[in-house]
């Protein structure tokens, strides 16, 4: 979907996503010392707002103006400051390198998917961390939710290989299970999680 499609989706519901941070973002980032962070494809800002609450200086990048407006209101309500940038990641916006880069549930076809991964990797300062979370391709047939198009899905090792070629040190690349609460009860989604670090020097 393009930006106008997402604008419409964000208009239709009070919150498209949960107000809580992604469980894997919370788990992987909780013990890191706060610094500067980028939340790429931030949506309504749930992860960016949580980071700001933990003491991070956060820039949230999103291509839907409606999502950014909602994110600003949510950040104000939470009493935290988040810098918002309207930009399309497929156009590789000029962003300053930071200590932590989040790329959470951004699903694009090739070659855009790999190009955005490479751009995200270039935004990690030496010693910093890139965390990629998304729906795994296997989720399409064995899990719950997520895009129905296999062309926009990947497996962890595919993401890891792109990041290795940028020079990042891949610390983890694995499938992880996430419980999704539905009207029919709890369902299991199969996500991918890739954690990669920019090696100093």
Task: Please annotate each region the language model reported.
Residues 114-126:
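A short glycine-rich, Lys/Arg-flanked "PGG" loop and its adjoining helix->strand segment in the class I
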Residues 64-66:
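Conserved SAM/SAH-binding beta-strand->alpha-helix loop
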Residues 1-32, 35-43, 138:
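Conserved class I S-adenosyl-L-methionine
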Residues 127-135:
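Conserved beta-strand signature within the Rossmann-like core of class I S-adenosyl-L-methionine
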Residues 98-113:
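A short SAM/SAH-binding and catalytic strip from SAM-dependent methyltransferases
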Residues 71-72:
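Conserved SAM-binding loop
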Residues 77-89:
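Conserved SAM-binding strand-loop segment of SAM-dependent methyltransferases
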């Amino acid at each position: 979907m393009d930006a106008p499609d997402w604008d419409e989706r964000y208009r239709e519901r009070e919150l498209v996503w949960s107000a809580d941070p992604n469980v894997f973002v919370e788990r992987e980032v909780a013990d890191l010392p706060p610094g500067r962070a980028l939340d790429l494809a931030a949506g309504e800002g749930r992860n960016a707002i949580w980071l700001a609450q933990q003491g991070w200086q956060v820039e949230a990048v999103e291509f839907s103006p409606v999502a950014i407006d909602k994110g600003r209101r949510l950040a104000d309500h939470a009493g935290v400051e988040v810098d918002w940038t309207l930009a399309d990641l497929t156009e590789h916006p000029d962003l300053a390198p930071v200590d932590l880069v989040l790329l959470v549930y951004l699903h694009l076809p090739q070659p855009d998917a790999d190009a955005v991964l490479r751009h995200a990797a270039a935004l990690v300062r030496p010693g910093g961390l890139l965390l990629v979370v998304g729906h795994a391709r296997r989720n399409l047939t064995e899990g719950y939710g997520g895009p129905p198009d296999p062309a926009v899905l990947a497996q962890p090792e595919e993401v890891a290989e792109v990041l290795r070629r940028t020079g990042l040190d891949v610390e983890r690349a694995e499938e992880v299970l996430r419980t999704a609460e539905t009207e029919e009860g709890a369902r299991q989604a199969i996500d991918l999680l890739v954690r990669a670090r920019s090696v100093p020097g």
